[in-house]
């Protein structure tokens, strides 16, 4: 019998499910193994109101396979003009789980994001007062800052001062990519956590150029030097409850990736848990996978852990070149663990 690991069913604390036809193509892969997911609001137009979030949630549920137990956790897209009252209403009514801060033009569909943190001071104070978490894409967008330094600069220029002004605000530093981010989160005593993606644990910036330009490895924040990847692996597998799973699975049509100006995003949902399992096995930390994938996130958000389980088995699984017409992370590779029941 193959070696097995049974854990509390996991959640994905950062995913892009898109909308319309793309939503129909991808949502089943997230719902396959994650019971809940924090859904990003950067649609066109973005999800900026309670009514828009409620409508989007309904579309997600309609697109889910019949009989699948999956709960989308909705987020509000913050702008310079976000209304604190609308945010509070959505949070109190259980429509919003959190609010998302995109610095304007930092990533896909972020043009309507926040241009200056001073513009949303009232919003952040209200969120702090009601216990509504703030999710941050932590990069500066200044033209004079190297793209590989944008996360580290964001910590120094913005995140430290934001947390000083709002010490009771719960903050998730999303999809961290650097040693500096690991150290900053690890030195914080409360109200700060971070999500880590499978691709930032698996590849470094050399991977984007291995044998040519690998557009399917282009994401934002971009993958970094090897020392940063190793720091992320240490954090993820450490058992530290401040770090938890967030895939940042971000699908794009092949025509949008394989072009002269390709889109940022890696579609990792189909084999996300298998990818994380490979990392934890390589780091001899399988005993910490349940915490990272299933327990730390709910604890930070003040939610109960799921009451069912999933089982991984040490049986090789071949990742296809295409999944529903999209290129998945690990395309053409073999992963050593698979989720039961397999796809």
Curated annotation (Swiss-Prot):
<feature type="binding site">
    <location>
        <position position="42"/>
    </location>
    <ligand>
        <name>substrate</name>
    </ligand>
</feature>
<feature type="binding site">
    <location>
        <position position="248"/>
    </location>
    <ligand>
        <name>Zn(2+) 1</name>
    </ligand>
</feature>
<feature type="binding site" description="via carbamate group">
    <location>
        <position position="100"/>
    </location>
    <ligand>
        <name>Zn(2+) 2</name>
    </ligand>
</feature>
<comment type="function">
    <text>Catalyzes the reversible cyclization of carbamoyl aspartate to dihydroorotate.</text>
</comment>
<dbReference type="InterPro" id="IPR004721">
    <property type="entry name" value="DHOdimr"/>
</dbReference>
<comment type="similarity">
    <text>Belongs to the metallo-dependent hydrolases superfamily. DHOase family. Class II DHOase subfamily.</text>
</comment>
<feature type="modified residue" description="N6-carboxylysine">
    <location>
        <position position="100"/>
    </location>
</feature>
<dbReference type="InterPro" id="IPR002195">
    <property type="entry name" value="Dihydroorotase_CS"/>
</dbReference>
<feature type="binding site">
    <location>
        <position position="264"/>
    </location>
    <ligand>
        <name>substrate</name>
    </ligand>
</feature>
<dbReference type="GO" id="GO:0006207">
    <property type="term" value="P:'de novo' pyrimidine nucleobase biosynthetic process"/>
</dbReference>
<feature type="binding site">
    <location>
        <position position="16"/>
    </location>
    <ligand>
        <name>Zn(2+) 1</name>
    </ligand>
</feature>
<feature type="binding site">
    <location>
        <position position="137"/>
    </location>
    <ligand>
        <name>substrate</name>
    </ligand>
</feature>
<dbReference type="InterPro" id="IPR032466">
    <property type="entry name" value="Metal_Hydrolase"/>
</dbReference>
<dbReference type="Pfam" id="PF01979">
    <property type="entry name" value="Amidohydro_1"/>
</dbReference>
<dbReference type="GO" id="GO:0008270">
    <property type="term" value="F:zinc ion binding"/>
</dbReference>
<comment type="pathway">
    <text>Pyrimidine metabolism; UMP biosynthesis via de novo pathway; (S)-dihydroorotate from bicarbonate: step 3/3.</text>
</comment>
<feature type="binding site" description="via carbamate group">
    <location>
        <position position="100"/>
    </location>
    <ligand>
        <name>Zn(2+) 1</name>
    </ligand>
</feature>
<keyword id="KW-0378">Hydrolase</keyword>
<feature type="active site">
    <location>
        <position position="248"/>
    </location>
</feature>
<dbReference type="InterPro" id="IPR006680">
    <property type="entry name" value="Amidohydro-rel"/>
</dbReference>
<keyword id="KW-0479">Metal-binding</keyword>
<feature type="binding site">
    <location>
        <position position="252"/>
    </location>
    <ligand>
        <name>substrate</name>
    </ligand>
</feature>
<protein>
    <recommendedName>
        <fullName>Dihydroorotase</fullName>
        <ecNumber>3.5.2.3</ecNumber>
    </recommendedName>
</protein>
<feature type="binding site">
    <location>
        <position position="14"/>
    </location>
    <ligand>
        <name>Zn(2+) 1</name>
    </ligand>
</feature>
<dbReference type="GO" id="GO:0004151">
    <property type="term" value="F:dihydroorotase activity"/>
</dbReference>
<dbReference type="GO" id="GO:0005829">
    <property type="term" value="C:cytosol"/>
</dbReference>
<feature type="binding site">
    <location>
        <position position="137"/>
    </location>
    <ligand>
        <name>Zn(2+) 2</name>
    </ligand>
</feature>
<dbReference type="GO" id="GO:0044205">
    <property type="term" value="P:'de novo' UMP biosynthetic process"/>
</dbReference>
<feature type="binding site">
    <location>
        <position position="220"/>
    </location>
    <ligand>
        <name>substrate</name>
    </ligand>
</feature>
<keyword id="KW-0862">Zinc</keyword>
<feature type="binding site">
    <location>
        <position position="175"/>
    </location>
    <ligand>
        <name>Zn(2+) 2</name>
    </ligand>
</feature>
<feature type="binding site">
    <location>
        <begin position="16"/>
        <end position="18"/>
    </location>
    <ligand>
        <name>substrate</name>
    </ligand>
</feature>
<comment type="subunit">
    <text>Homodimer.</text>
</comment>
<keyword id="KW-0665">Pyrimidine biosynthesis</keyword>
């Amino acid at each position: 019998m193959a070696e097995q690991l049974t854990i509390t069913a996991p959640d994905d604390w950062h995913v892009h499910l898109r909308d319309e036809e793309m939503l129909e193509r991808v949502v089943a892969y997230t719902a396959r193994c994650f019971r809940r997911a924090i859904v990003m609001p950067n649609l066109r137009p973005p999800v900026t109101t309670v009514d828009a979030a409620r409508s989007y949630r309904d579309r997600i549920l309609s697109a889910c396979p019949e009989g699948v137990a999956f709960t989308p956790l909705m987020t509000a897209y913050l702008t310079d003009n976000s209304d604190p009252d609308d945010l509070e209403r959505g949070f109190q009514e259980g429509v919003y789980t959190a609010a998302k801060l995109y610095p304007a033009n930092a990533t896909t569909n972020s043009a309507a994001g926040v241009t200056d943190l001073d513009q949303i001071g009232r919003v952040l104070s209200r969120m702090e007062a009601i216990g509504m978490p703030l999710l941050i894409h932590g990069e500066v967008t200044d033209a004079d800052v190297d793209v590989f330094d944008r996360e580290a600069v964001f910590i120094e220029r913005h995140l430290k001062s934001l947390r000083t002004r709002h010490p009771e605000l719960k903050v998730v530093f999303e999809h961290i990519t650097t040693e500096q981010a690991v150290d900053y989160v690890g030195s914080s005593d409360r109200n700060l956590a971070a999500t880590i993606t499978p691709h930032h644990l698996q590849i470094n910036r050399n991977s984007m150029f291995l044998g040519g330009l690998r557009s399917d490895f282009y994401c934002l924040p971009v993958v970094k030097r090897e020392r940063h990847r190793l720091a992320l692996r240490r954090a993820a597998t450490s058992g530290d409850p401040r770090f938890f799973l967030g895939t940042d699975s971000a699908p794009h049509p092949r025509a949008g990736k394989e072009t002269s100006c390709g889109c940022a995003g890696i579609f990792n949902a189909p084999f996300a848990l298998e990818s994380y399992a490979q990392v934890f096995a390589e780091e001899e930390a399988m005993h910490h996978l349940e915490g990272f994938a299933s327990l730390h996130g709910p604890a930070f958000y003040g939610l109960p852990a799921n009451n069912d389980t999933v089982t991984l088995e040490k049986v090789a699984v071949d990742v296809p070149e295409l999944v529903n017409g999209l290129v998945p992370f690990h395309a053409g590779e073999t992963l050593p663990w698979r989720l039961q029941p397999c796809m």
